[in-house]
Structures are given as structure tokens and as C-alpha cells.
A protein has these predicted regions:
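Short, solvent-exposed helix-helix connector turns and helix-capping sites enriched
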Residues: 11-12, 138
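Adenylate-forming AMP-binding core of the ANL superfamily, especially NRPS adenylation
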Residues: 1-11
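Conserved phosphate-binding and hydrolysis motifs of nucleotide-dependent enzymes
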Residues: 51, 135-136
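Short proline/glycine- and acidic-rich turn/helix-capping motifs at secondary-structure junctions
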Residues: 123-134
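AMP-binding/adenylate-forming catalytic core of the ANL superfamily
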Residues: 8, 18-21, 26-118, 128, ...
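A secondary-structure boundary/capping signal
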Residues: 1-2, 50, 125
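Phosphopantetheine-dependent thiolation modules in NRPS/PKS and related acyl-activating systems
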Residues: 136-148
């Protein structure tokens, strides 16, 4: 520990999650071969699909590289068989690739990049994603938008 390391919170009633002596703040990440830290999301965003852990952000990142997608958000929705499943809300681009975009094309793209349990069952197309004042997607507003 050095003089710049955080040792706790100012609220004495706040319960700390400690892992190996470190304070866990809920961020998920990994250290690459060059010792760079990559933050990939939040632990509370993780969903379980048929017993497998899936981080929706990984699906979002894969789809952000897909031709025809202007912007996209992946998240978990309840499922009676697998407890949860991946759903995707996509805003197509205005070009030919966006006009040709289909739910099956999105599923196929994810299937070639990630494990089967990460393939979205639900695909919704929107004109725009609902965002808050800081520009973050508001997931609770997505469930009532789009068509599968």
C-alpha cells in the first residue's frame, strides 16, 4: 500500500467486499500480456444463461464491429427455460448494410465470434437507443421497445 491507495470508504456503515485484501468495487476486468488493465464491465451486469456466465458487454462489443450496425446494446432478459437469455437492441446504419440487417445475420455474426450461450435469442431494431443525460443507455427503457 502506498499513500495514494484507497483503504476504505468514509461511510463507516458501508460493508466492504474484500478479496485477497483488496476492496472489490464490482468492476470486471483482466490484465493482458503487457500488464495493461482492461475493464470489461460490472459484476452485477453478468447474467447466467443455461448455467453459463455471460457478460452482455462482450456481445455488445462484438456487434459494434458488425457492418450495418450504427449502435447496439446487449442485456439479459428473464427466460423460463434458461433463467435468463441475451437480448440485443440494434440501431441499423442508414446505408445498404443497415437496410439488409436481419436478426438472423446478427445471431450468425455473434455465433462466429462467441460461444453459443452468448448468441442473442431476442433481436430488436430501433431508430435510436434510449439514453440518459450523460449518454448512457437506459436498459429499463429498452424492454418496451422494438420487435423481435
Amino acid at each position: 500500500t502506498n499513500s495514494t491507495a484507497m483503504t476504505g470508504y468514509t461511510n463507516p456503515n458501508l460493508r466492504l467486499n474484500k478479496v485477497d485484501g483488496l476492496i472489490s468495487i464490482g468492476d470486471l476486468g483482466y490484465i493482458d500480456e503487457h500488464d495493461f488493465l482492461h475493464v470489461v464491465g460490472r459484476a452485477d451486469d453478468m447474467i447466467i444463461v443455461g448455467g453459463e456466465n455471460v457478460h452482455p458487454q462482450s456481445v455488445t462489443e462484438v456487434l459494434e464491429a458488425m457492418p450495418g450496425i450504427h449502435e447496439v446494446h446487449a442485456g439479459g432478459v428473464e427466460d423460463s427455460e434458461t433463467f435468463q437469455r441475451i437480448a440485443v437492441w440494434a440501431v441499423p446504419t442508414a446505408d445498404a448494410a443497415g437496410k439488409a440487417l436481419t436478426a438472423d445475420a446478427i445471431r450468425d455474426w455473434v455465433r462466429t465470434k462467441l460461444a453459443d450461450h452468448s448468441v442473442p435469442r431476442d433481436v430488436h431494431f430501433l431508430a435510436k437507443l434510449p439514453r440518459n443525460a450523460t449518454g448512457k443507455v437506459v436498459p429499463r427503457l429498452l424492454n418496451n421497445h422494438g420487435e423481435a
